[in-house]
Amino acid sequence: MFVPFLIILREGLEAALIVSLIASYLTRTQRGRWIGVMWIGVLLAAALCLGLGIFINETTGEFPQKEQELFEGIVAVIAVVILTWMVFWMRKVSRNVKVQLEQAVDSALQRGNHHGWALVMMVFFAVAREGLESVFFLLAAFQQDVGIWPPLGAMLGLATAVVLGFLLYWGGIRLNLGAFFKWTSLFILFVAAGLAAGAIRAFHEAGLWNHFQEIAFDMSAVLSTHSLFGTLMEGIFGYQEAPSVSEVAVWFIYLIPALVAFVLPPRAGATASRSM
C-alpha cells in the first residue's frame, strides 16, 4: 500500500504542479478564460491513462501462465526504466520547468484561430506523460502485491496529490519541493531495484532465463516473508527471503550505478528548486 501511495503521490504532485503552474500563468497574464480549455487537456489525459490501465489489466488476465509471467517481467522492466528516468529527469529539469511551461503556453496560444486545441494538446501531453508513468508502475506493483491495499494506496496518493495541488495553487501551503523530490527519488531507486530483481524472477518462471538460479542465501529464519515486517519489505522493496544468485546480482548491478549517479552533484542549471 505504501509504495503505490508514495509513487502516485509523487507523480500526482508533479502533474498537479504542471496544472497549477499553467493555471497561475494564465491568470497572471490576463488569460484566465483559457483555464477551462486547460482542464479539457487534463481530463483527456486522465481518461487515456485510466482506459489504458484497465484495458491492459483486463487483457492480460486471459494469458496462459507462462505468457502471464513473461508479461509481468516485461512490465517490471518498463517500470524500472520509467522510474529511473523519472528520478533523473526531475533532477535535471525541475529548476527550469516553470519557464519551459510558460513558453509552451505562449507558443500554444499564438497558433492562430486553433490555439485552443493547441493548448489542450500541450496540457494533454504534459499530464499524460506523468499518468502513463504511473500506469506502468501500478501494473508492476499490483502484480507483485495482490489485494485491495495497493489500489487503495494509489487512490489515497492521488487524492493527497490533488489536495496539495489545489493548496499550492491557492497559496495555502509552501512545500520544500527540493527535499521532497530528493528523498522520494532515493526511495524510488530502491523500489526500482526490487522490481528489476522481480523481473529476472518472472523471466525465469516464464522459461526465458535459467542461469544462476542457485539460492544466494536463506534469510527465512531471520526475516520470513510470512512475518509482518517481512511482508512489508516484500511489498515495498520486493524482498525475498531466499533469492537466487541472478536476482541478487541484478539488484546490485542496477542499484549501485544508480546510487552513484544520484549522489553525484547535478550539472549546472539542473539543481532542484527549493520551494514553491
From Swiss-Prot:
Keywords assigned: Cell inner membrane, Cell membrane, Ion transport, Iron, Iron transport, Membrane, Transmembrane, Transmembrane helix, Transport
Highest taxon above the source species: Bacteria
Principal subcellular localization: membrane
Ranges annotated as spanning the membrane: 2-22, 35-55, 70-90, 119-139, 148-168, 180-200, 245-265
Membrane topology, as annotated: Multi-pass membrane protein
Species, as recorded: Escherichia coli O6:H1 (strain CFT073 / ATCC 700928 / UPEC)
One MF term in the entry's GO annotations: ferrous iron transmembrane transporter activity
Induction: Expressed in response to iron deprivation at pH 7.
Gene: efeU
Topological region Periplasmic: 1, 56-69, 140-147, 201-244
Keyword Iron: yes
Biological role: Uptake of Fe(2+) ions across the membrane.
Cytoplasmic side: 23-34, 91-118, 169-179, 266-276
Family: Belongs to the oxidase-dependent Fe transporter (OFeT) (TC 9.A.10.1) family.
Subunit structure: Part of a ferrous iron transporter composed of EfeU, EfeO and EfeB.
Keyword Iron part of the UniProt annotation: yes
One GO CC term, this protein: high-affinity iron permease complex
Pfam families the record matches: FTR1 (PF03239)
Signal peptide start and end residues: none
Name of this chain's protein: Ferrous iron permease EfeU
Location relative to the cell: Cell inner membrane
